Amino acid sequence: MEMSAAMFARVSFYPTLLYNVLMEKASARNWYDRIDEHVILGALPFRSQANDLIEKENMKAVVSMNEDYELTAFSNNTEKWRKLGIEFLQLATTDIFESPNQEKLFRGVEFINKFLPLKQRIGGLSSSYQPENVGSVYVHCKAGRTRSATLVGCYLMMKNGWTPDQAVDHMRKCRPHILLHTKQWDALRLFYTNNVETKS
């Protein structure tokens, strides 16, 4: 099943990416949306969008939930982002059938935390503070709907002490077309139990 799921994700990548481009042009969907003052949730950032994101959105870092093959043709890899002065974290997760595992979700939240102002930092996370790094983090997968939304939901829960329902409701207000399936909901609930509920 894992092999066939990974193969299906690969085969469907370009057609579904084209669908996302068309939906952004033909509907009210945005390529990306700001979730709070520090986190942007979006689709695959094309190389042509990089400078705009840096200049207009004060983007300092990128978290990609994509696998390597999804980044090759249109988006920057670690080296290309670093040349632009952007920190990059890749938490590769297979599209459609998988949710990011708990270790990846925690690493992602910890990474985002590095770019928050000191007074807004999530307590208990081991991330160094450098004032020059304060800015926005662009969190993405292919469409900015499922894998990346799962990570952003975890960030919102830890930052605000929210439940999974509260985090998802907030994301839907900002980005109505997010799409979470049972596996993503299960991941959010487990993350909440392990990292939020036990600390409140």
From Swiss-Prot:
CDD domains: PTPMT1
Any Gene Ontology biological process: cardiolipin biosynthetic process
Domain of life: Eukaryota
Pfam families referenced in this protein's UniProt entry, alphabetically: DSPc
Tissue specificity of this protein: Highly enriched in testis.
Reaction(s) catalysed by this chain's protein: a 1,2-diacyl-sn-glycero-3-phospho-(1'-sn-glycero-3'-phosphate) + H2O = a 1,2-diacyl-sn-glycero-3-phospho-(1'-sn-glycerol) + phosphate; O-phospho-L-tyrosyl-[protein] + H2O = L-tyrosyl-[protein] + phosphate; O-phospho-L-seryl-[protein] + H2O = L-seryl-[protein] + phosphate; O-phospho-L-threonyl-[protein] + H2O = L-threonyl-[protein] + phosphate
Uppermost EC category: hydrolase
Assigned GO CC terms: mitochondrial inner membrane; mitochondrion
E.C. no: 3.1.3.27, 3.1.3.16, 3.1.3.48
Matches recorded under InterPro entries: Dual-sp_phosphatase_cat-dom, Prot-tyrosine_phosphatase-like, PTPMT1, PTPMT1-like, Tyr_Pase_AS, Tyr_Pase_dom, TYR_PHOSPHATASE_DUAL_dom
GO molecular function annotations of the record: phosphatidylglycerophosphatase activity; phosphatidylinositol-4,5-bisphosphate 5-phosphatase activity; protein serine/threonine phosphatase activity; protein tyrosine phosphatase activity
Keywords from the named record: Hydrolase, Lipid biosynthesis, Lipid metabolism, Membrane, Mitochondrion, Mitochondrion inner membrane, Phospholipid biosynthesis, Phospholipid metabolism, Protein phosphatase, Transit peptide
Record keyword Disulfide bond present: no
Residue stretches making up the Tyrosine-protein phosphatase domain: 31-197
Record's subcellular location: Mitochondrion inner membrane
Pathway: Phospholipid metabolism; phosphatidylglycerol biosynthesis; phosphatidylglycerol from CDP-diacylglycerol: step 2/2
Residues annotated as transit peptide in the record: 1-28
Family recorded in the similarity comment: Belongs to the protein-tyrosine phosphatase family. Non-receptor class dual specificity subfamily.
UniProt name for this protein: Phosphatidylglycerophosphatase and protein-tyrosine phosphatase 1
Annotated organism of origin: Drosophila melanogaster
Record lineage: Eukaryota, Metazoa, Ecdysozoa, Arthropoda, Hexapoda
